[in-house]
Regions:
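Short, glycine/acidic-enriched loop or turn micro-motifs at the edges of active sites
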Residues: 4, 112, 134
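Conserved ATP-binding subdomain of kinase catalytic cores across diverse folds
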Residues: 1-70, 98, 102-103, 195, ...
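Conserved protein-kinase catalytic-loop segment immediately C-terminal to the catalytic Asp
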Residues: 111-119
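Catalytic-loop of the protein kinase fold
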Residues: 102-112
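AlphaC helix of the protein kinase catalytic domain
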Residues: 69-80
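C-lobe/activation-segment region of protein kinase-like
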Residues: 124-213
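Short, solvent-exposed loop/turn segments that connect beta-strands within catalytic domains
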Residues: 50-54, 120-126
């Protein structure tokens, strides 16, 4: 079911004037699937007119069985056998994000909750990128949008730790080495990004500090 986010959501909740929003999400999902990215399979769009120009929407999607999102996996890392394949999950995640960028798709909200993982029959792992609402396929995605996706994902890791300080007081299941491993794998698959990435990350600490301040002031 579609809902507005932020302050708009508190006012308009699940009422929309834009009748094409779910159709655009369907289009991006189909483009992602054609590009080899595992994502949500949309089987139907339900559109209900409320009054005047306002509508409510529902997407009917095929369930991704036996999967878990990365927030749940990290919160219960000690209990989940899948976490033992952490290195493989990181590599597959880097590949999935790179594949998405290779077909020029920018994810509007790439964070841990929108990444699903599951075991495959061969003993490996499969990574799904979901919730492509408001995402867009560009003619050329460009380096800045790629980095915006990657930094958004990294910030969600930091945010998870900050919000669960008591749980992670002794150790956090994602180390700096893990974060570097993700970047190295992504660069390995996208060699054109090596030089601009080095320059971009020089200002990363300052950018990161600003986002942490915003979370403290604005509550995330």
């Amino acid at each position: 079911e579609y809902w507005h986010g932020g302050m708009v959501g508190k006012i308009f909740k699940d009422f929309f004037c834009d009748g094409m929003r779910p159709v655009r999400e369907l289009s991006v999902c189909e483009a992602a699937s054609r590009g080899g990215i595992k994502t949500t399979e949309i089987v139907a769009i339900v559109k209900n007119k409320v009054f005047g120009p306002l509508y409510k929407f529902r997407l009917v999607t095929k369930e991704i069985t036996e999967s878990i999102d990365l927030i749940e996996l990290l919160l219960h890392s000690g209990e989940n056998r899948l976490f033992k394949q952490k290195k493989q999950i990181i590599n597959e995640l880097a590949k999935a994000v790179n594949d998405m960028h290779n077909v020029d798709i920018y994810h509007a909200d790439l964070h841990l909750k929108n990444i699903l993982v599951k075991s495959d029959p061969g003993g490996g792992v499969q990574v799904y990128i979901i919730d492509l609402d408001k995402s867009k396929q560009y003619e050329k995605i460009g380096f800045q949008r790629k980095m915006k996706n990657i930094l958004r994902l990294d910030r969600s890791v930091v945010k998870l730790r900050r919000k669960n300080q008591e749980l992670f007081s002794k150790t956090f299941p994602v180390s700096n080495t893990d974060r570097v491993r993700f970047l190295k794998k992504y660069i390995e698959l996208d060699s054109e990004s090596v030089k601009p990435l080095r320059h971009y990350l020089q200002s990363y600490n300052n950018t990161h500090a600003l986002h942490k301040l915003w979370w403290l002031v604005g509550g995330g």
